[in-house]
Every structure is written in structure tokens, then in C-alpha cells.
């Protein structure tokens, strides 16, 4: 994603959520028609500035749901600033595990995402 798309209007968290929702609408659908993934609006996502592979990154954690359906679960998202290529690399992971603990699954997603390395 171009740097300007994340950093426009100084509303970084809103821009990241907008990108998540647009990707969810296009690529992540439920088993019935006219359903797609969106970020749940009832709760504000957790948002933190951090570093991954010595690069500025924004961590966003929250809950996703399927629009027009009854599926939901936690997600974790990293937007990693890649100045060399004038872009943000977006990493997004989510889990669906009805009626079961999701904490360990989210920890696994987080560990995989934090291990990203940029090659020269």
C-alpha cells in the first residue's frame, strides 16, 4: 500500500481499518451470498506504534465479523513502513474458532508476523 494511503489525514488507525475492510469485502466471504469480512465497529481496536525488523510498524488488534452473517473472531494487523519502496507492507491475520479459546491462535499469528525480515 502506498505510504500516502496510510498516512493521509493523520488518521492512521482509520486508514488501516479502511484498507482491512476493503480487502475483506473483495476477498473474504462467508458461505452464503452477500457476506464479507469487516472490522467490528462496536469496539475500538487496540493500536500501537512498534518496530518489526528495525522498521516503523503499526500494530492493530481487534475483532472482525462477517457482514450479514454470524461469524466473528479476533484479528491482528501490522502495517510495516518500507521507505525504500515507498510503501507499507500489510500483514493481517485472523482466526475463527467458535466456542473455543482463541488466545493461543492469536499468539501464533503474532509470532509469525513479528518474524518478518526484509531482504536487501
Map each language-model feature to its residues:
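Conserved polar/disulfide-associated segments of primarily extracytoplasmic proteins
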Residues: 1-91
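Surface-exposed amphipathic alpha-helical segments
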Residues: 86-120
